[in-house]
Amino acid sequence: GFRVKECHSDGEFECIRAALADDKAYLNVTSEDEHDPVIDRYIRTVKERTRSTYNSVPFKKIPTMMVIEMVHASNYWLNSFPANDGVSATQSPRQIVTGQLCDFKMHCMLQFGEYVQVHESHDNSMKSRTTGAIALRPTGNNQGGMYFMSLKTGERINRYAWTQLPMPSEVIDQVHQLACHNPA
């Protein structure tokens, strides 16, 4: 295990000061308009990764939920590999905190924004057994599940089975339609 000794934050986290003190951890809260270089650098890195992802997808407009998931994906991947200046040269922040490793065959199968048909639970009816979706990010579970945006509903769904397909222009148009109803 590990023990948190110090936490850097802004005023929003003042409410956890007592809980941290009970665990003998120090909460360093910055003043209004004050900056913490470590926090600022991490925020800048997440923004750069998110901007890079945003500019790599074929969509001109994307729904708010996709932007939020893009930020989560950037954070997920930053925590999935050891940082050059991190506390461990061999263990990722995710592994240190949760004990979970990043498995290439499970967690690195799709990139953000790829088109897939996710496999739905089915019965003996004539209903479709797949749904069009856009890959968002791994769930991080041990089964290799992924979060997707359903092209039918625009909602985030969690699936572990899918078929990767080329991106037709109709899918790009559908994402643009979803973005018009819920703009970023």
How would you label these PLM feature ranges?
Residues 1-184:
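Nucleic-acid-interacting cores, centered on viral/eukaryotic replication and modification enzymes
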